[in-house]
Design a protein with these regions (language model features):
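Acidic, His/Gly-rich catalytic cores of divalent-metal-dependent hydrolytic chemistry
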Residues: 154-162
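Flexible, glycine-rich phosphate/dinucleotide-binding loops
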Residues: 12, 82, 110, 142, ...
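Non-DNA-binding regulatory cores of transcription-related proteins
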Residues: 94, 98-102, 107-132
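Short, well-ordered coil/turn elements that cap or connect secondary structure elements
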Residues: 68-70, 98, 143
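A polyampholytic, Gly/Pro-enriched intrinsically disordered region
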Residues: 91-102, 146-154
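Domain-level recognition of soluble alpha/beta enzyme cores
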Residues: 118-147, 153-154
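Active-site catalytic microenvironments for nucleophilic, acid-base chemistry
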Residues: 36, 61, 65, 94, ...
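Active-site-proximal alpha-helix that buttresses catalytic centers in soluble enzyme cores
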Residues: 2-79, 83-86, 90, 124-130, ...
Length: 162
């Protein structure tokens, strides 16, 4: 399975939007990241998002940019910010037949999921930037021996998209 992990884009402050949806800059950053993924030939069998507005928006924008049906986005509590990595990985393991899955998620869980997939414990300190994306390949789940194929920052994705 190819697992793609993306932190949501920059969001509005709670005073401006109680649901902390994406800011205009955040929306543009995610559109750019999505265009880069499309240009790289990446598509998905499934996209998972948390129930938080900024995660749902990130998932929807990426879906739009890569040609994935937004109606097929799976909203789940199992990719929220404080979800233990074992729970998120279990959700992935329960998706037989899927080979390319994007999680549009939050910190700290994205970093913890990446670490869980790559090493035992939380030894791999994978850092995420809002709108950045990484790809980890796994043969089976759960595993601690995934392969980090790449991590691209928002700036690198912007260069690819242009």
């Amino acid at each position: 399975m190819e697992i793609y992990l993306m932190q949501h884009g920059p969001s509005l402050p709670k005073e401006q939007d109680p649901d902390e949806g994406l800011s205009p800059e955040g929306e543009e950053r995610i559109h750019t990241s999505g265009r880069a993924l499309k240009k790289m030939g990446i598509d998905f069998d499934a996209i998972l998002a948390s129930t938080k507005k900024r995660s749902r928006q990130t998932a929807a924008i990426i879906a739009q940019e890569v040609g994935f049906s937004p109606a097929k986005i799976i909203e789940t509590e199992r990719v929220k910010a404080m979800t233990p990595p074992e729970e998120t990985v279990k959700a992935l393991a329960e998706m037989p037949g899927y080979t390319k899955v994007l999680i549009a998620g939050h910190l700290p869980s994205l970093a913890e999921v990446a670490s869980f997939l790559l090493t035992e414990g939380s030894k791999a300190k994978v850092e995420f930037e809002r709108g950045g994306c990484c790809r980890i390949d796994v043969e089976e789940l759960p595993t601690h021996s995934g392969r980090l194929r790449w991590y691209l920052t928002p700036e690198q994705l912007q260069l690819i998209a242009s």
